[in-house]
Structures are given as structure tokens and as C-alpha cells.
């Protein structure tokens, strides 16, 4: 009986405690201020297409854009071939010897995925060099290091990758600038934002590129010519004529070069020049605005006024 009385006394005290307990959870929003979402884009402002100057008309722009797209396609496949086969690839060893693959992969990837803000293609011939015989374009050098001029000759002489391994084309026997893709790859490597002052001319022409690879020097995987030749042969063998390609044979060291006299650039800084040490060759910009220059017997000139001596 006494126990029941004590329970009766305690029940009124416990009832308010039970009544104050919540019957359902309080929404989180009512208990705490939610964090504001953070919007962050690490690549904000990235430029993913090569800029083309307003001096290019509609047809010029379309051709340059298509050529640049093919340059990216050529570089992308070269990179993919290396990533798949490494230096087990016979084509890789042919052009790069036993060099590690990372440098060549990077040289192609910067064309494919690098930011393109500091590259500009134009058509208005600001330095006057398109008037020089045989010029299809040129890097503007110190006049404007990010700019490349495409001259009218390019529109009538460059071919598309779909025609590779036809019309007598071979990798060894034809010029690297046969195609828009490889011509623009070469021009891009002169621009600091792409070549970064590292891709350079250490060998000239097919035979020197092959000799450089056989020497296993350190230059082949950042030699402009080697990078072009490898990309062309890998594309020819894998894509254009699968399993067959069109490697061809060299026509000799002087193929495609003027060994007599050459027109000089209209300004001292428009040649795509640099020095190399890998093959004992030197590359010297022509530095006079005169109409012609004498070329030593051990030298020849590239399109764009570049003097290359061995």
C-alpha cells in the first residue's frame, strides 16, 4: 500500500517531463544554418580553340580551322600510338630511338589539350613576307611571338589527311608540309606557348631525323622534324592505310630545299629560328632585308627564310 502511495505522488511530477519531449524530429534547417554551396571552376577562362584573327576572310578562316583540327587529330593519334605501344613500337624507335616516351607524349598533348589563348593565326601579311616567293606562311618571331601568318600559297598547296598515301605521297619521300596538319604542327611548335622554347630544329629532313634517332641523343623526342615525321608515319600505318602505311624511301638530303639563294625576310625577327646541337647542325635566322642572300654550300633555306647549316 505504501508503495502505491509513493507512485501516486511521483506520477504528477513525471508527466510534465514526458510532455516536453518532442514528438517528431526538428528539421535540420530549423536547428542549424546550412552551408552555402561553393561554386569553383578550376579551368575558368580556358581557351580550347585556336584564335584566328579578323584579317582572315570566311574561306580562309574555314580552311585554317579545318587545318588546325587536323593538326590536333594528327597529334592526338601520335600520342595514342605511343601510349598504346611505348617504345616497343617500330615506328617509335625509327624516329626516337630508345628515348623514354614521356617527352614525345607531352609534345603532342600540348597541341591537343594545351590552353590556346596565346596563339593567333592571321592572314593580313603584316610583315610583307607573303610576297616572297614560295612562302606559305611564317612565325612572326620577335615582332609578335604568339602570332603566325598564313599566306595565300598554303590554300593552293596543302592537302588533307584523307588523301594520305595517295597521289604518290610517301612519308620519307615527300615534304612534311604536304598536309595542313603537319605544316600547322610545325608552325605551332615555333610559338612559345606550344613549343615552350624546347621543341626545336636539331635535324633537318628525313635522313637527318633517322640518323638522330640512331644516335640515341637526347634531342630526338623534342625535335620538330622528328615529331612531324613520327606523327605522319603512325597515322599512315594505323589510319590511312591500316597495317600497310606508305613509309617510302628518302630522295636524299637536299630534297625540297633551295641550296642556291633565298629571299630574306622583310624584317629581322620574322624567321622561325633557333639553334640546335644534337646533330651538329645550326639554324640561323636570315637577318637582312635585302632581296637575296648568298647561301654557303653546306647550307640551305627553309620556307620562312630560315637558314639551316650542317
From Swiss-Prot:
Its main location: secreted. One of its GO terms (molecular function) is metallopeptidase activity. Keywords: Allergen, Glycoprotein, Secreted, Signal. Residues 247-310 are annotated as: Disordered. InterPro entries: HRXXH (IPR029482), MetalloPept_cat_dom_sf (IPR024079), PRA1-like (IPR039124). Glycans are attached at residues 57, 87, 143, 216. Residues 1-16 form the signal peptide. GO terms for cellular component: cell surface; extracellular region; fungal-type cell wall. Coiled coil: none annotated. Residues 300-310 have a biased composition (Basic and acidic residues). SUPFAM superfamilies: Metalloproteases ('zincins'), catalytic domain. Belongs to the ZPS1 family. This is Major allergen Asp f 2. It comes from Aspergillus fumigatus (strain ATCC MYA-4609 / CBS 101355 / FGSC A1100 / Af293). The lineage of its organism: Eukaryota, Fungi, Dikarya, Ascomycota, Pezizomycotina.
Amino acid at each position: 500500500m505504501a508503495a502505491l502511495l509513493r507512485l501516486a505522488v511521483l506520477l504528477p511530477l513525471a508527466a510534465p517531463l514526458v510532455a516536453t519531449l518532442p514528438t517528431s524530429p526538428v528539421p535540420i534547417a530549423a536547428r542549424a544554418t546550412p552551408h552555402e554551396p561553393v561554386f569553383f571552376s578550376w579551368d575558368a577562362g580556358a581557351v580550347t580553340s585556336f584564335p584566328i584573327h579578323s584579317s582572315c576572310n570566311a574561306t580562309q578562316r574555314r580552311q585554317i580551322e579545318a587545318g588546325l583540327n587536323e593538326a590536333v587529330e594528327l597529334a592526338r593519334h601520335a600520342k595514342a600510338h605511343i601510349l598504346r605501344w611505348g617504345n616497343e613500337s617500330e615506328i617509335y624507335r625509327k624516329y626516337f630511338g630508345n628515348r623514354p616516351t614521356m617527352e614525345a607524349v607531352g609534345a603532342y598533348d600540348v597541341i591537343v589539350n594545351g590552353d590556346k589563348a596565346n596563339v593567333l593565326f592571321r592572314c593580313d601579311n603584316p610583315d610583307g613576307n607573303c610576297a616572297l616567293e614560295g612562302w606559305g606562311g611564317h612565325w612572326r618571331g620577335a615582332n609578335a611571338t604568339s602570332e603566325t601568318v598564313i599566306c595565300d600559297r598554303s590554300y593552293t598547296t596543302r592537302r588533307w589527311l584523307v588523301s594520305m598515301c595517295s597521289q604518290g605521297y610517301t612519308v620519307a619521300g615527300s615534304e612534311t608540309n604536304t598536309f595542313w596538319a603537319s605544316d600547322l604542327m610545325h608552325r605551332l611548335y615555333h610559338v612559345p606557348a606550344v613549343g615552350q622554347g624546347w621543341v626545336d630544329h636539331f635535324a633537318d629532313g628525313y635522313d637527318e631525323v633517322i640518323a638522330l634517332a640512331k644516335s640515341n641523343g637526347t634531342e630526338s623526342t623534342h625535335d620538330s622534324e622528328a615529331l612531324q615525321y613520327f606523327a605522319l608515319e603512325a597515322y599512315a600505318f594505323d589510319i590511312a592505310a591500316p597495317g600497310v602505311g606508305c613509309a617510302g624511301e628518302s630522295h636524299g638530303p637536299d630534297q625540297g630545299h633551295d641550296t642556291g639563294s633565298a629571299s630574306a625576310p622583310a624584317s629581322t625577327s620574322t624567321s622561325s629560328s633557333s639553334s640546335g646541337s644534337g646533330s651538329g647542325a645550326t639554324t640561323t635566322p636570315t637577318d637582312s632585308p635585302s632581296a637575296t642572300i648568298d647561301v654557303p654550300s653546306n647550307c640551305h633555306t627553309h620556307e620562312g627564310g630560315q637558314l639551316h647549316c650542317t
